């Protein structure tokens, strides 16, 4: 359960462009992940919201490899804790780059972040590398 799978983000953005001019659309970028206990039951299972560095730390602590879903363009992994399997989806440089590339491809006005308080240095380095920021806006 990716936070913002690029295939779905693309569909929403392309639909939005049929109704709204590109210069009025900013793409929302998640700056967090979810740690889901499994099995998932709709309406019952609740995920814990974690930041991207916490996600990486959990993978390291549990010695599990981080996988990458090529369709969603999103990293994820599974681990066990106290007899419960968990699945973690979060953002990394690869997933962020896919979203930034989409902004350029569709000529959108910029980005907005759902959660800016979770510092993820790689995001800001990539953002500065790919875009010119003027007067506090992208």
Region locations from a protein language model:
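Active-site region of glycoside hydrolase catalytic domains
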Residues: 1-40
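Soluble non-cytosolic domains of exported or imported proteins
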Residues: 3-10, 90-97, 118
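Generic structural signal for well-ordered alpha-helices
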Residues: 9-17, 100, 124-131
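Short acidic/polar active-site loop segments enriched in Thr and Asp
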Residues: 23, 109, 114
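Conserved, mostly hydrophobic/aromatic
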Residues: 27, 103, 111
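Glycan-binding loop/region signatures in secreted carbohydrate-active enzymes
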Residues: 29-102, 128-138
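C-terminal functional modules
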Residues: 100, 114-116
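Acidic-and-aromatic substrate-binding clefts and catalytic sites of carbohydrate-active enzymes
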Residues: 116-122
